[in-house]
C-alpha cells in the first residue's frame, strides 16, 4: 500500500517535516511517497500546490496526506480546497494552548527556527568547525578543548554524529577511529588515555558494518565480514575493559544516537 504525504509550510518546512515523519513512522506497513514543499507564501504558489496535491490524488487513487504549518489564513483556505487529508499542525496544538494560557499566539512564520540568540548560533558554528577539524583522529592535540570524543571502528557513524551534536546541541565533539594496529596493542591508544573521561564508544553489528564498508571498498579485506567481526569483538572488549560507555548504533538514526549520547553522558545543550 502506498500513500503520498506532503509536508508544506510558508517557511522552511522543517517543523511540518519533522512532526509528519514522526507520525508516519508509526505505520510501518504503509509505503509513503514524501514530498516537502517549503515557502508557500503567496496565493499563486498555494494554487499551484493544490494542483500538485490533486494530481497525486488522481495517480494514487487515494487522497494524499497534507501536513502543514501555514500561518496565513488566506493561503490555508486555498490549500484546504485540495483533495487531501489535511493535518493542521499549528492549529491542532496552538488552539488548546491559547485557551490554557489565555493568550493569543503570534503565528509568526519561521519562528521555531529563527536565530534569536547570536551567542548560541556562534557556539554551534564553532562546534561544527571543531568537529570538522578534529575528524578521524586528525588533531589529537586539541582534545583538551573537546566536550566529547567519540571512538569506534571505521564507518561506525562517528563523523555524522559529531556534526549533528555540534549543529543541534553546540557540543564540541572530536572522533578517533580505532584501527587494527590499536587493537593489536590490546590497550587504549596513547592519544586517548589523558582524555578517558570524555570518551564515548560506538559499536555496530558486523553484518551492517560490512555492508557499509563494501560501498566504500568492495571485495576488500577491510570490508569482509570476518574482518568486521574481529574488529567489533575486540573494540567491545576494550570498551568493557576500560569501562568506556558505548552504544550499538545499528538500529538508530543519527538523531537517536545523539540524543542517547546526551542522556548517557549528562552533557547539556549549549544555548
Curated annotation (Swiss-Prot):
The record's catalysed reaction(s) read: [pyruvate, water dikinase] + ADP = [pyruvate, water dikinase]-phosphate + AMP + H(+); [pyruvate, water dikinase]-phosphate + phosphate + H(+) = [pyruvate, water dikinase] + diphosphate
Q: Which cysteines are joined by disulfide bonds?
A: none
Task: Check the UniProt entry and state the signal peptide residues, or none.
Answer: none
Annotated positions binding ADP: 152-159
Name the Enzyme Commission number(s) assigned to this protein: 2.7.11.33, 2.7.4.28
Tell me where on the tree of life, at the top rank, the source sits.
Bacteria
The record's keywords, sorted A to Z, are: Kinase, Nucleotide-binding, Serine/threonine-protein kinase, Transferase
Keyword Transferase listed? The answer is yes
One MF annotation (Gene Ontology) recorded for this entry: ADP binding
Has UniProt tagged this entry with the keyword Transmembrane helix? no
Q: What does this protein do?
A: Bifunctional serine/threonine kinase and phosphorylase involved in the regulation of the phosphoenolpyruvate synthase (PEPS) by catalyzing its phosphorylation/dephosphorylation.
User: Which NCBIfam families does the entry link to?
Assistant: PRK05339.1
Which family does the record assign? Belongs to the pyruvate, phosphate/water dikinase regulatory protein family. PSRP subfamily.
Quote the protein name from its UniProt record. Putative phosphoenolpyruvate synthase regulatory protein
Q: Which organism is it from?
A: Marinobacter nauticus (strain ATCC 700491 / DSM 11845 / VT8) (Marinobacter aquaeolei)
